[in-house]
Regions:
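Gram-negative bacterial Sec-dependent N-terminal signal peptides
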Residues: 5-6, 10-32
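Cytosolic catalytic domains that perform sulfur/thiol-centered chemistry
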Residues: 33-446
Length: 446
């Protein structure tokens, strides 16, 4: 008789932990094409046998947004996030790399939780990849006090939340007062004209940064830009972009200016489009100017460092100046930009990862473009001695990638973070500034 024929008659609630383990190791090798064919374990049983829980929900729910009214918030302790919706974007090699990164072996006990359909999809894919000891986590999300979440998950909103807010429905972490939505990008609103989130305004990044070094504009210019778009210090601003880092650049500068509540649509325009939510065409709506910001600018000057302030962070154990540039940029085989000629890196800077080149941020993204798990990011940084109790300032070429990373660190609860505005462009413009080139490891920044 096939082993899976035995499953319908077995109640895992009535068997001992030893029997549960036996079922996990023996029966899970049977078909896992649907969640109801897998044995069920509790978290304590899974932990006793060094197993791993995998959350198959969207990262928004993993991070802390409730999936329904008054629903649980967060994820099980040390759970990994492998959303069923990502599977189409993950080839076998990428899935294998993901498993290797998280030390998953074919023999690792794995318990899935989420909805049944998502669990079944992830189980089938894992089984095809050689993972045979699969189960369902029977008590998942049942104990609110043990759940973990992103400390400031509300700063990274997700599409349905924004749509519900626009529809006037009650939402978790609702803005305290007036709120606005903007798309941010460089230059004229080309893509915006064709399709954008209904009601969204448009902000050209040239309004917050300028040549010759693409540093932020003066505080007076920043005040004028905010007034033009009807933004006060107490306006909740929700930003999105075709490129997340464009929206993040604007968001970070708004926080510097003193806008108290600035949020990003996690994953940007792509996540809205993928969700199949309404869109509209046309020119940006006229914004009613707001002549008074209502507070001094800058409200948080510590969020933006100049070159001398950045230099003061080098070679310190209580601080990190962090390069958010690709590895080829970090070791000096490319500058990453057509308009930046010098190649190399700030001597003593720590590598915070980024992506394959100056226009990508894969190291920080899930397959759908949303923020990777905080545990993964923190582990990546820890390997280069970048720690949450330090004073940390991020930089890249001109500030976009650094700003996206800043927004993630802020959501993770890293309190003493900033952006070195000038970045490699300004640092390399002075030949007296020390530069490093070539392959090197974390010890180079000690």
């Amino acid at each position: 008789m096939p082993l899976n024929f035995l499953l319908p008659g077995i109640s895992m609630k009535r068997v001992s932990q030893l029997t549960a383990l036996a079922l996990l190791m023996g029966l899970a090798a049977a078909s896992t094409s649907a969640a109801d064919t897998m044995p069920t374990l509790t978290l304590s049983t899974l932990q006793q046998h060094n197993g791993v829980a995998i959350d198959t929900r969207l990262s928004a729910f993993y991070n802390g947004w409730p999936q329904g009214a008054n629903g649980p918030q967060g994820h099980e302790p040390q759970a990994l996030n492998l959303a069923a919706s990502w599977l189409g974007a993950l080839n076998d090699e990428q899935l294998s790399a993901w498993a290797k990164l998280h030390n998953l072996q074919a023999s690792t006990p794995i318990a899935l939780y989420g909805n049944a359909d998502d669990n079944a999809k992830v189980a089938a894919r894992l089984k095809a990849a050689g993972f045979t000891h699969l189960s369902s986590l029977g008590d998942a999300l049942s104990q609110a006090d043990r759940l973990q979440k992103l400390p400031h998950f509300e700063q990274l909103v997700y599409p349905q939340w924004l749509h519900d807010l626009q529809q006037g429905k009650p939402v978790t972490a609702a803005p305290a007062g007036h709120w606005k939505v903007f798309e941010a990008a460089w230059g004229a609103p080309k893509f915006y004209l064709l399709s954008h989130i209904p009601g969204a305004g448009y902000i050209d990044t040239n309004g917050v940064e300028s040549e010759p070094l693409w540093n932020k504009v003066s505080d007076a210019q920043l005040k004028a830009m905010l007034a033009k778009h009807g933004i006060r210090h107490d306006t909740t601003v929700i930003l999105y972009g075709r490129d997340v880092y464009a929206a993040a650049r604007v968001a970070q500068i708004m926080l510097y200016a003193g806008v108290k509540d600035v949020r990003l649509l996690d994953g940007g325009w792509k996540t809205w489009s993928d969700a199949g939510l309404p869109v509209e065409r046309g020119t940006p709506p006229k914004q009613k100017p707001e002549p008074e910001f209502g507070a001094p600018i800058p409200g948080q000057p510590q969020l933006m460092l100049n070159t001398e302030q950045a230099r003061a962070l080098l070679h310190r154990q209580d601080a990190s100046l962090v390069s958010i540039r690709s590895w080829p940029e970090f070791i000096g085989t490319t500058s990453g930009y057509s308009y930046i000629k010098p190649m190399g890196e700030i001597a003593g800077a720590r590598w915070g990862h980024a992506g394959s080149d100056s226009t990508h941020m894969e190291d920080f993204h899930n397959p759908d473009g949303t923020m990777r798990s905080a545990d993964d990011i923190a582990a990546m940084w820890k390997s280069w001695n970048i720690l949450p109790n330090q004073q940390v300032s991020f930089y890249c070429g001109t500030g976009w990638r650094a700003s996206e990373t800043f927004m993630y660190a802020r959501a993770m609860g890293w309190n003493n973070v900033s952006v070195y505005d000038g970045g490699w462009y300004e640092w390399s413009s002075n030949p007296k500034n020390p530069v490093s080139r070539g392959e090197r490891g974390p010890e180079s920044s000690r």
